[in-house]
């Protein structure tokens, strides 16, 4: 709905503002949830509850300082950022100033999420994320509409619409922080009671704790910063390359909007699931590393990669098969042909991002923190060369960005996989992890395409055709993966509602054990 309100040009400004916001958020505090969960889990595994509580408190101070400092920089430096880096996106300073306090809110929220994850509970994080997205979606639409109405005579009308979308981001984050704050208030007596019963007196000083936080968070920040830099570099190269070809600013902003707020937005949904799996894996993996249980480490890594592939393959195939119908359904007023083609040709990035995300989490958990950074830098260098070459010497236009978005995680995947294999001395099982999900997804894709086309020919309505197509997609993939023994009963239990799914599977004789 927001795309229909502010248009592709407004979404281009919105996406460019978020590129800046994301990289500054990463620099200030993005790595805190993972870092805090890793440090808290390590302390709790050794029953050092006083140390775990101190890690949390010092991490919170660090987040408040770094998040506050970066928020002030964005608010007062928004005009300079627009003039220096985004001259083609007029008015981008408006949504940037709205996003400035969001950096501070997310910094504090990230530390609270890291605490709960380190305590091996993902529920507060999951609920807060759902609340955040609901508030974000509702407020973004309402705020975009009212701000565009109030500034209808402004030359920066699209920028005001983009600012409305960022208001939703701010209030969504604030609502999630309020929820986590309430949970922490209820949970704090338990933390203090554990700390009082702990007979181990921490020997570390405040300086030692801050050093530990920095050495843990900096590699995570650098790794994520490199990834986010690829987005900003893409926007910058694309901007200059298109200007050099004589393309006007409106067309540039529109194409950038389609790429960022349709293609990247849709592929980011399954990628977010992979990120959540990687985040939930870290505390448990750190505990095994702390106790030196190498068998448990290998088993957990194997399962994390397998679960990611079970989700990533059908997501990539499904988005490719239903690319144009999904774009037309979600963004009816926009260019669904270009957006659909981007999604169709670039959905394979989901598989590579899923694998690179989980393997980066593994390397960080086993204290090989510098390797994901090095791999990301190597991949970024290759990515820049590929994107620049395609934009400079071919007529691919925005599709060069799509191609680059596939090559970046592909290189990281290869380098991470090699390092995980060397450091842990094992090879990932191939048939059930990769071959079964791939084959099941291909068959699922064929069935989904046939069902969609049949229903669309009869009804001529996208929503009438896409619903049965999605039902067939889910049912066929579920049946094929189980029938081909891609998942055992015990593995199925690890999924949400896994026991209920096993009951359904038994009725259709899909499980062999």
Regions of interest found by a model, annotated:
Residues 1-34, 64, 71, 75, ...:
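Signature of the first transmembrane helix
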Residues 2-23, 90-91, 158-163, 209-216, ...:
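Interfacial/gating helices of multi-pass transporter permease domains
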Residues 30-45, 271-293:
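Helix-loop junctions and terminal segments of transmembrane helices
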Residues 80-99, 302, 320-350:
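Interfacial segments at transmembrane-helix termini and the short loops linking adjacent helices
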Residues 96, 101, 112-142, 146, ...:
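Alpha-helical transmembrane segments of multi-pass membrane transporters/permeases
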Residues 123, 134-183, 370, 380-417, ...:
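Membrane-interface helix-loop junctions in multi-pass transport and translocation proteins
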Residues 169-176, 180, 184, 200-283, ...:
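Transmembrane helical elements of multi-pass membrane transporters/channels
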Residues 450-513:
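Membrane-proximal transmembrane or re-entrant/amphipathic helices at the cytosolic face
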